[in-house]
Each structure stands twice: as structure tokens, then as C-alpha cells.
Amino acid sequence: NPHSTAGLTVYSPWDPAGLEDLDDEIRRLIPTKVDFKHQHDTPQDAAGHVKSALLGVSVTFIIHEGKLMLGGSQSIYFLEFDGPRSREFFVKIQED
């Protein structure tokens, strides 16, 4: 993930309200505000940098016998903190 205003996480897909809760809590913890010390673009962009730094931009997974090993209640989510906009992502597979 080459972006500084996006993140990647694993979260449960079972209840869609859970993603709303996650989004609400991220916004509560790191609100968009005009008094960030680094204001290179917009307040939303500045908040996006902080959110991305705290939540992370990469996740490691295990692939076993050609299958992605996720728990039954796990899905991969891309988190957009300064958009929508076009994004790219990269996948790297390496052996043990």
C-alpha cells in the first residue's frame, strides 16, 4: 500500500454494523480538525496521515496449499481516509 492516507486491516464481516462501529471509533479517536500541525493539503488529508500511521498499511497472511488462511470471521478491508480516489495496492508472496 503506497499511500499515506489509507490503511489495511482484518475485521469481521458478519455484522455490517461492525464496520460502521470501526469507522465511528476511528473518526472519534482521530477527528478531522483544522489545527493539525502538518497541513500540507486539507484537514482530511492530515487526519488521514495520522489514521494510516496508527492503523497500518500492511498485513501479513499465511497461504497454505494455495489457500489464504483467514479465520471464519475474518475479511480483509482497505480503509480510505482521504477520498474517494484511485488507489493501487501491491501483493507480495514469499516463501518461508
Region locations from a protein language model:
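Active-site histidine-anchored catalytic micro-motif
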Residues: 1-96
